Amino acid sequence: MAEAAEPEGVAPGPQGPPEVPAPLAERPGEPGAAGGEAEGPEGSEGAEEAPRGAAAVKEAGGGGPDRGPEAEARGTRGAHGETEAEEGAPEGAEVPQGGEETSGAQQVEGASPGRGAQGEPRGEAQREPEDSAAPERQEEAEQRPEVPEGSASGEAGDSVDAEGPLGDNIEAEGPAGDSVEAEGRVGDSVDAEGPAGDSVDAEGPLGDNIQAEGPAGDSVDAEGRVGDSVDAEGPAGDSVDAEGRVGDSVEAGDPAGDGVEAGVPAGDSVEAEGPAGDSMDAEGPAGRARRVSGEPQQSGDGSLSPQAEAIEVAAGESAGRSPGELAWDAAEEAEVPGVKGSEEAAPGDARADAGEDRVGDGPQQEPGEDEERRERSPEGPREEEAAGGEEESPDSSPHGEASRGAAEPEAQLSNHLAEEGPAEGSGEAARVNGRREDGEASEPRALGQEHDITLFVKVKLTALGCSRIAIKKYLRAGYDGESIGNCPFSQRLFMILWLKGVIFNVTTVDLKRKPADLQNLAPGTNPPFMTFDGEVKTDVNKIEEFLEEKLAPPRYPKLGTQHPESNSAGNDVFAKFSAFIKNTKKDANEIHEKNLLKALRKLDNYLNSPLPDEIDAYSTEDVTVSGRKFLDGDELTLADCNLLPKLHIIKIVAKKYRDFEFPSEMTGIWRYLNNAYARDEFTNTCPADQEIEHAYSDVAKRMK
């Protein structure tokens, strides 16, 4: 708690007797209502006035559901059984002795700058030092609801209000349960200690603060102008923070903290801000939190601003409301316009972050009574979010919408497709982003997408990565007109788009029943081809270059190779395979097989040869065999997107029709394929083995 330095050396002033447990909040409309008059430097009566800087907890949020979330266990503990008074203690300050024991244990400590054990409450705000005129306070008191009376000292957790003359410092220690009450002027400090756990720090206006602690961390914070504060703690979890003006009364500390009048089930958190940044905090069940803001700050001449007049009208209209509603309205009158509330809820912490409330928002939506008790305010809805769920008013704030948007999992843009959509030979498009929906393919552009891309290819989509770009890719349909067709060039573009992490639409095309719209789109062109923002791209090599240039870092990964020789590695393998599989003459088969093996051995040598970045110039060990996963390193590149689909076809078709397999001694090729089969970008874009075999059924004829 921010503590102001206390002036010393000022003569003590008259002190009031401690007989009165706590000042009682007067009824609205009566002269001298709570918060209506400021106490002067002289003539302070302990039996009639509350200490300076205390705010009426009953009035500013002690009787309603508004309770602060800041239940803070103070660090001050003591077990003193004797009463002491320092020199300079005012004669009027009476210290009860052992005969005046209360039923609870209580410890009072002065909140001097040296007391660092006291935790500093959050949300503490300073006010302007000037007191507003008495008529203003009386007028505000008339607007507030009836306040139930309570006592400040009694049983366990009782609070002690004490103030001394300017600069005086009073320390009093008494037996268990003794209470100390003293009143004085600005800057006075009273320290009184009782049994372990209870403590009270009291100061007057201009930096004075009062803190009282009860069992298990219950607390009440009431702050006045320029940092005045009162902290009183009650049962575990319940806390109230309230701020008022100089001279306002504070009531806190009935048996076991009941006098705090939390009014909300344990765990609720309410934050309400008053004039000049004052705040009220209270906690309730299940981490529910609420902050109220909106009362205008009064001008220096005592006149109410237009916002205050509007609040007066609202208060007038509140006649006939329940006491809880009126208490809520009274709490709202202690707020500053423009102060934005925030909810804080976390499991076990009763903290929740929420958006901002504005005066005049739509009606509040209330959850069930099992969750929390909340009163509706005429000012508008209050934020209602909990750790287990949320309820928002129709006029939810931008922060609320942003939080909801943030709550949407980014996993929606996943790198895997959960299901396979129907591949229509008639050219129907399917969105490839892991969350396909009916009619999505016909959308011109998905939310947040930069481009509209359609890829017409020949393979069926089983999974794809996703990002911000919608691509339409047209695939060649399989032999049944719907399933994946075999085409290494289509899979090449598939892999590139997946590795780039983009959203794109895929359309399979049945070449026997090619739709008229596709013929008009790319006349005389067979898949694969692509449309990018309406522009048709038909050449596979140019599409690859275009995508690498258009979808460039830093947003999209670079897929180009670092070593130029990786681009040409294995470029003759597929040609040798085609000659080998198409040959039907037995006498020529051996020659074609040797040519294929030669090309494969060349590729295997490159895969086993270490790349320059694999060789450590400072290492004493020579690297003779590469351990990289792919052609250009451990990551897939454009070269892999070109070569891997071809190697996969060779492996399937050669075994099926020529009983040919890659030799086991070609460790580089097998390591390369095994690493590729471990990547979804490759395996999930491969056509089925049956589709590949069917595609070569006419080509791979029996040898004669």
Curated annotation (Swiss-Prot):
Residues 1-446 are annotated as: Disordered. It is a single-pass membrane protein. Phosphorylated. Expressed in brain, placenta, pancreas, liver, lung, heart, kidney, liver, spleen, soleus muscle, and brown fat. Sequence repeats lie at residues 157-166, 167-176, 177-186, 187-196, 197-206, 207-216, 217-226, 227-236, 237-246, 247-256, 257-266, 267-276, 277-286. It is found in: Cytoplasm; Cell membrane. The keyword Methyltransferase does not apply. It catalyses: chloride(in) = chloride(out). InterPro entries: CLIC (IPR002946), CLIC_N (IPR053823), Glutathione-S-Trfase_C-like (IPR010987), Glutathione-S-Trfase_C_sf (IPR036282), Glutathione_S-Trfase (IPR040079), Thioredoxin-like_sf (IPR036249). Monomer (soluble state). Interacts with dopamine receptors DRD2, DRD3 and DRD4. This is Chloride intracellular channel protein 6. It comes from Homo sapiens.
